[in-house]
């Protein structure tokens, strides 16, 4: 059972208990540290059984519990309610109810413990290098950990009288007949440190009014009307989950950007935050501004092999845990990606097109120019004019620095893995798109027509060369990548779908690309696989080698739409949105790439993040795609092509440079 607020989250069992171990990664986490590894409730020394759980909201849950009666029948004379809310730390309202005709004496105990494990250590049970300490007074229990200047503390308190010890707190109760007892428990987290690249001080516990905040968030978003109830559920779930995944980096001045996903990626990720902001632009454009400003703040300035940092490079990942603080991991911050930098320029341009906010474009001109310069000055590792990647941090850096960042995601048709550097095809599309959009910004806002002309010339040349060098004539498809020798990595993969939304594909080749994407080797009926069936490494439950990723499909569908393949885009949208209904409206990070005719439902991927930011954003981009929404100067153009399963669809109060508008569409595809 999970509840979350930004990068603070709680994972517990069905009773609400936390018992962390290398095989049980439960706990209270904040800023990449587990602040609570034990939180176990007993009554008279016995654990409780679960009657039901209320998933009240993303930040709140309630557990209804009873003692073990020793029979299959629940005939308890006592029950317990735990109502929990998260926000920095967490708060738990604990209520014990006596249903008997006589008073009862009870010993209620909360065992509490903190291992202060780094998020990267929770599965390892590694021995900590610092020292644990505790302090007890009449009103609280403080548990702490310190390693040099790295300091984390958890403070536990109760509104009702209790006895604290270093392992928890105990209540000795006498509850009258048909009466109840309650207390409010607070678990507050704090962090104090000073490390090489970042300074963090103060408490992490914000205790905001999350319910009021969510209400305001939902009130600002467009209202959807349609005749498909499951789509209503998916739309609302997407907006709520996007609210849940918001967090405020300490550099963002209290404004929010999307964290990547629960549980392992509740942090700022350049690529994920950019793509999620792109997906959500027609619905919550304010996410994009915060994302752009935060990433601009952490843009690379020097050559640093440990962090894979270059001047102009956009950050990949920012962590606050112990391993980052002592550079056992390079994530404070880490720059090892090859796509976030061009995508930064893409988002900046798309943000202005939707909002008309030229102020941000002008303020971020130096960062955008630095990002564009990075493409030519640092990303062309092979000297052939293409963006490629090879980690300089051989010990802890990422090998694959494209979005498919697992070890086996880039392979030849026969399963061999290419040497580094690797130039994956979609990176070239992003670079092309960034240059074209950068040219528009330079000409319109930066008043530099010569620079705009140069970027346009570079983009045109890149498109010409790409359509020659990456094309596989025998397969009528684009290669997955070029290897270290400049030879084509000839596997068929979903990466070529991203070429469509970037616009780098010659129109004469687009039909062949779409034919592959919608063919039986890639399209399952639920969505497009990451790797085509028949390729040597294909596995329908392989992370990047056969599973279906909703975010991937949303951008592919958008690209199809941009090339005029509106019906095909609607089919992809229909498959993904059908799948969402089987996940109660919450699309996971990925699901199995099995043919739809084999299964009555999409097969779950066992370790998928959920909620996950760009999966949460996928239905939003698919709605934009189906309705054909495009900003055109000071108005929005609409060209709906909906799956026939959707009779009618309306979005009301879409925000943008035009104010707010309503759009409508009917299903015909």
Question: What do these predicted regions represent?
Answer:
Residues 608-646:
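Catalytic cores of secreted or luminal carbohydrate-active enzymes
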Residues 89-91, 98-267, 358-365, 369-380, ...:
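Acidic/polar, glycine-enriched structural segments that form the non-catalytic walls/loops
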Residues 1-77, 84-89, 99-103, 114-121, ...:
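An extended acidic
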Residues 105, 174-176, 182, 441, ...:
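Beta-rich accessory regions
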Residues 272-303, 495-507, 553-569, 573-576:
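Alpha-helical support elements that line or immediately flank enzyme active sites
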Residues 64-67, 225-268, 293-335, 381-423, ...:
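Extended glycan-interaction surfaces of carbohydrate-active proteins
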Residues 71-83, 130-131, 161-163, 311-341, ...:
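Aromatic/His-enriched, Gly/Pro-containing loop or helix-boundary segments
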Residues 197-209, 213, 230-237, 284-298, ...:
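Extended, well-ordered alpha-helical scaffold segments
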């Amino acid at each position: 059972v999970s509840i979350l607020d930004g990068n603070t989250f709680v994972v517990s069992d069905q009773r609400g208990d936390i018992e962390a171990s290398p095989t049980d990664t439960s706990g209270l986490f904040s800023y990449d540290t587990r602040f609570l590894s034990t939180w176990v409730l007993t009554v008279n020394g016995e654990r409780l059984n679960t009657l039901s759980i209320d998933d009240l909201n993303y930040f709140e849950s309630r557990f209804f519990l009873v003692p073990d009666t020793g029979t299959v029948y629940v005939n308890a004379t006592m029950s317990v309610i735990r109502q929990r809310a998260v926000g920095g730390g967490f708060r738990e309202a604990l209520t014990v109810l006596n249903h008997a005709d006589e008073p009862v004496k009870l010993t209620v105990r909360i065992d509490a413990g903190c291992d202060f494990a780094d998020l990267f250590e929770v599965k390892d049970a590694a021995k900590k290098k610092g020292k644990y300490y505790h302090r007890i007074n009449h009103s609280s229990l403080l548990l702490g950990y310190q390693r040099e200047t790295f300091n984390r503390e958890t403070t536990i308190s109760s509104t009702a009288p209790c006895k604290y010890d270093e392992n928890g707190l105990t209540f000795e109760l006498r509850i009258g007949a048909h009466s109840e007892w309650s207390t409010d428990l607070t678990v507050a987290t704090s962090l104090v440190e000073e490390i090489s690249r970042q300074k963090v001080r103060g408490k992490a516990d914000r205790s905001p009014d999350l319910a009021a905040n969510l209400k305001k968030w939902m009130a600002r978003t467009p209202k959807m009307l349609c005749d498909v109830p499951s789509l209503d559920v998916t739309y609302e779930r997407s907006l709520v989950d996007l609210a849940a995944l918001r967090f405020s980096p300490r550099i963002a001045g209290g404004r929010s950007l999307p964290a990547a996903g629960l549980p392992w990626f509740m942090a700022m990720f350049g690529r994920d935050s950019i793509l999620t902001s792109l997906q959500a632009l027609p619905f919550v454009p304010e996410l994009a501004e915060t994302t752009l400003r935060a990433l601009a703040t952490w843009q690379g300035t020097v050559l640093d092999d440990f962090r894979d940092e270059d001047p102009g490079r956009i950050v990949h990942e920012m962590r606050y845990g112990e391993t980052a603080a002592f550079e056992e991991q390079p994530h404070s911050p880490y720059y090892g990606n090859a796509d976030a930098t061009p995508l930064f320029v893409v988002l900046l341009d798309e943000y202005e097109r939707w909002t008309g906010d030229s102020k941000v474009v002008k303020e971020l001109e130096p960062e955008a120019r630095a990002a564009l310069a990075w493409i030519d000055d640092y990303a062309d590792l092979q000297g052939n004019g293409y963006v490629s990647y090879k980690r300089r941090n051989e010990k802890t850096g990422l090998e694959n620095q494209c979005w498919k960042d697992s070890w086996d995601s880039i392979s030849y048709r026969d399963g061999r893995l290419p040497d580094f550097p690797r130039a994956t095809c979609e990176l070239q599309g992003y670079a092309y798109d960034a240059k074209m959009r950068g040219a528009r910004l330079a000409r319109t806002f930066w008043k530099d027509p010569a620079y705009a002309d140069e970027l346009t010339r570079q983009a045109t040349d890149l498109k010409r060369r790409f359509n020659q060098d990456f094309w596989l004539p025998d397969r009528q498809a684009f290669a997955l990548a070029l290897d270290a020798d400049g030879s084509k990595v000839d596997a068929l993969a979903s990466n070529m779908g991203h070429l469509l939304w970037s616009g780098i594909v010659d129109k004469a080749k687009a039909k062949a690309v779409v034919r592959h994407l919608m063919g039986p080797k890639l399209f399952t009926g639920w969505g497009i696989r990451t790797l085509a069936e028949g390729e040597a490494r294909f596995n329908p439950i392989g992370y990047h080698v056969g599973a279906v990723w909703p975010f991937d499909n949303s951008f592919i569908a958008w690209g199809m739409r941009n090339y005029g393949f509106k019906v095909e885009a609607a089919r992809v949208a229909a498959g993904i949105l059908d799948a969402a209904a089987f996940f109660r409206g919450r699309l996971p990070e990925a699901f199995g790439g099995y043919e739809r005719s084999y299964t009555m439902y999409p097969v779950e991927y066992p370790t998928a993040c959920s909620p996950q930011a760009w999966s949460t954003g996928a239905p939003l981009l698919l709605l934009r795609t189906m309705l054909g929404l495009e900003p055109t100067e000071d108005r929005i153009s609409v060209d709906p092509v909906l799956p026939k399963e959707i009779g009618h669809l309306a979005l009301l109060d879409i925000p943008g440079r035009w104010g707010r508008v309503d759009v409508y569409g009917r299903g015909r595809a």
